[in-house]
């Protein structure tokens, strides 16, 4: 039987990708060309960690929180379920209770609210804090969203961020789900081994199981 092919659910990183207002713009350039070096092109990358598809570490919103290097990489590899929660302003326990989530360890939410990697949204659907204990009771260890944040864009309290990690749930943001169906997949979304970082870009891929 042919093994299912991997499907990319990452935002392509290029000089047109949107960034958080006021954050470091993404830039890639060849800083040392083959003509200059005599053998190779060497690129230079400048970016915010929270550009494109990325994970958050607790240090992002808690000075005493774990950094990327301290996170359990097992969380970012394994079975995941995609569900559709489109056309909602916010998502919490009430909205997820209708879904069968028993045995799910990684949950990806399709909100279908934006989908334009080169435009930063003005408003996004967000997660309410009561989602965290509900997901924890189900045994879910990772939540993924197709928007830049699990909290409202202008929010300073970051209740969802805090409650999710308090309940042992890791955060994956800016995945691209508009070209895949609901259902069960194998997920790989490994962060880089960054020793002191508050997050990391990832190449997130899935394949049906």
From Swiss-Prot:
Zn(2+) 1 binds at residues 50, 54, 56, 173. Signal peptide: none annotated. Its cofactor is Zn(2+). Zn(2+) 2 binds at residues 56, 161, 173. The keyword Zinc applies. Gene3D superfamilies: Putative cyclase (3.50.30.50). It catalyses: N-formyl-L-kynurenine + H2O = L-kynurenine + formate + H(+). Pathway: Amino-acid degradation; L-tryptophan degradation via kynurenine pathway; L-kynurenine from L-tryptophan: step 2/2. Homodimer. Its EC number is 3.5.1.9. It comes from the Bacteria. Binds 2 zinc ions per subunit. One of its GO terms (biological process) is L-tryptophan catabolic process to kynurenine. Substrate binds at residue 20. Catalyzes the hydrolysis of N-formyl-L-kynurenine to L-kynurenine, the second step in the kynurenine pathway of tryptophan degradation. Keywords: Hydrolase, Metal-binding, Tryptophan catabolism, Zinc. GO terms for molecular function: arylformamidase activity; formamidase activity; zinc ion binding. The keyword Metal-binding applies. The active site is at residue 60. Belongs to the Cyclase 1 superfamily. KynB family. It is an enzyme of class 3 (hydrolase). This is Kynurenine formamidase.
